[in-house]
Amino acid sequence: MDGSQGSTDYGDHVVLRYGGTREMVPLIRHEQMLDMLMERARQIVQGFGNLDTRNMYLFRHEYNSPTLLYPITSASQITSGSILEIILVDRTEAAVIPHVVEPESYMRPTFCDFCGEMLTGLMRQGVKCKNCNGNFHKRCSNAARNNCGAPGAPGAQPSRPPILPPIPTTPTGFPVAALSTPTGLPHTLIEHSYRQFTVCKVCDHLLVGLVKQGLKCRDCGVNVHRKCAMELASNCVLSENAISRVNFTDPEGPGSSSSDNIPLFRLPGQVGTRATEKKKLEGWMMHFILSDPERRLKHYWMMQSNAIHLYNEYSEGIGVNPNRVYRIIPLAEITSVVQNNGKSVLAKHPPHCFEIRTTTNTVFCVGEDYHAFSGGPPKKIPRSMSVRPSSNTTMWFQFIKESLQPPSRNEDNAEQALEFANLYQVLSDKTLGSGQFGTVYSAIQRHSGKEVAVKVISKERFSKKGSGAESMRAEVAILQQTCHPGIVCLEFMCETKDKIFVVMEKMNGDMLEMILSQELGRLNSRATKFLLVQILCALKYLHDQGIAHCDLKPENVLLSDMGSNFPQTKICDFGYARFIPESQFRKTVVGTPAYLPPEVLQRKGYNKSLDMWSVGVIIYVTLSGTFPFNEGEEISEQIQNASFMFPTEPWSEVEPLAVDLIQKLLKVEIEARMSIEQCLDHGWLKGEQLYRDLRDLEVRLNTPRYLTSPQDDILYGTLVNP
């Protein structure tokens, strides 16, 4: 996008959506408009992976039409306010190979390889495929998702060449590939009682019991044990007519709302995170457990999802069978990888190459060192089962050792990096978010198995003047001296030559995620008040310590449980926090503009009162699901326009006291802005129901009360046992 977009009003825009990512893009009419939108969409997608093997298309949402998505083929189809969905389709589609079947009579109990149910009857209970030897019900052999897995079977067609084709669509407007091939959609599993003998799709064992023997996918009908559900591949395909027409008007649709306010969405962070192509290693490996050296096993090893997966089956051209997993070794359970320089455990076998030691005291002995085998060369393994050149034991040893290390550079202080790696296993493909200078990953504490959050800060992001490094150290210093139930806890810090690792407690989501997950895109007053009091109590603690957060927003309010309407909250991300004594002001650039008061945006002096403005914006976006201000007008003018600030929808459903509190917080004059104490004493944040909700949380947490007081017990006439 060129610089001219900086002055474009939000009134002329489109929204690009990809999964959970949503970005508002100004719309400028010219010949290259569609190309520019496609380029921006490509940049969004590339932040999540590589596009080399997939085609990208834009589809327009039409909520009032039986066809919910329409492909964009020309710029004339795009109107202001349109919501454009980014769709990816694999360039090489898997060939659809039908089964070649004939009736079969079975002399022993046999189960359908498609649905898992027993083939019943006296004669000709089912059909058998000549190519793959699969056994099916007659009705299952022709099912749309039942594709013959035999390589070279009749009917196989060559893959489409990897070039950009025109969009192949059905009469409903969807890409053919998107409808005919699995897309990694997760299953929706529910308990099910089976009237016929049925086997598990993962382990092929019978689902036993009288009722509720297993789980059945609501959409595609696959059956699994409860214990096998985690191993079920995410390859669900919705059955026909599973998606029905929406019978309501989506508030995001063009022209569906009379309000000009900007819908709430996740604002881009200060640090752009882009997924990098991770090198992979896979191949057949010989291994055994040290306690059982006689049992030599060969499995197809694959490193994925921060764990080593050991598969029973692998076929060239098809790959591994995801349903045949022998064992999964999480990296977080590996304590060390040690090269073996000793003798063989058993004299009749060659010595193993290296050992993988785990927290469960299991030692995996991997590979066979024929060079160290004394007493003559061993019997050679058949060529078809030998270790592939790209997956020899030396490469696996180095790869696992590197995977156990935190994301770092070679010139890092090795001693510090080793100390950190011994304590924590960073799950580098599990990104939680990003802050001012670093990326936050999920990690596992090795000795306890506890999941934590690790912020990995690259010192390359800091300016040469060192202000960035000082800011980072100031953030850590603030976290080290704070101790409050409403503030995220710092557990550990480690600094190397090139990186800083900050370990904090991990929560399960943030306030913005909770708001956007609601059906109406906003919270009700009861939940809002419950969360707000927690935020204010934590903020009061910070202000009493002389600390201003300076970047308060829903993204920086973490929640303990996304499944609860009344979770505990904790404030995080102190990258912009400042020590501001009483009667002093600062002028440094801080925070996220959408939540900052005018004095910060205009580079005037600000004090801790800027956090109270942010609280007002948080209340507004939580109750309405929109931002309070547009960029096209002065904030002071918008505040004077009550009909603009508080349109009938949805503010007619909100108590007038809530509107009064927002107006007293969103004061342009710093002196007129409400303080924390005044805010907590406001009538909207009083009431027996709110008191009960807060007291219940304190009892659940089993901590000293910090949200209510004994005076509240007397005031509301309810004494709750501490």
UniProtKB/Swiss-Prot annotation:
PANTHER family: PROTEIN KINASE C, MU (PTHR22968), SERINE_THREONINE-PROTEIN KINASE DKF-1 (PTHR22968:SF15). CDD domains: C1_CeDKF1-like_rpt1, C1_CeDKF1-like_rpt2, PH_PKD, STKc_PKD. It comes from Caenorhabditis elegans. A zinc finger (Phorbol-ester/DAG-type) spans 98-148, 186-236. Its cofactor is Mg(2+). SUPFAM superfamilies: Cysteine-rich domain, PH domain-like, Protein kinase-like (PK-like). It comes from the Eukaryota. The modification Phosphothreonine is found at residue 588. It catalyses: L-seryl-[protein] + ATP = O-phospho-L-seryl-[protein] + ADP + H(+); L-threonyl-[protein] + ATP = O-phospho-L-threonyl-[protein] + ADP + H(+). This is Serine/threonine-protein kinase dkf-1. ATP binds at residues 432-440, 455. The active site is at 551 (proton acceptor). GO terms for molecular function: ATP binding; diacylglycerol-dependent serine/threonine kinase activity; protein serine kinase activity; protein serine/threonine kinase activity; zinc ion binding. Converts transient diacylglycerol (DAG) signals into prolonged physiological effects, independently of PKC. Role in the regulation of growth and neuromuscular control of movement. Involved in immune response to S.aureus bacterium by activating transcription factor hlh-30 downstream of phospholipase plc-1. Residues 279-407 form the PH domain. Highly expressed in embryos and at lower levels through the four larval stages in adults. Present in a region bounded by the anterior and posterior bulbs of the pharynx and an area of the tail containing the lumbar, dorsorectal and pre-anal ganglia. Expressed in neurons. One of its GO terms (biological process) is positive regulation of gene expression. InterPro entries: C1-like_sf, Kinase-like_dom_sf, PE/DAG-bd, PH-like_dom_sf, PH_domain, Prot_kinase_dom, Protein_kinase_ATP_BS, Ser/Thr_kinase_AS. It is an enzyme of class 2 (transferase). Disruption phenotype: Loss of movement due to severe or complete loss of muscle contraction near the anus resulting in partial paralysis of the tail region. RNAi-mediated knockdown results in a shortened lifespan, prevents transcription factor hlh-30 nuclear translocation during S.aureus infection and reduces survival following infection.
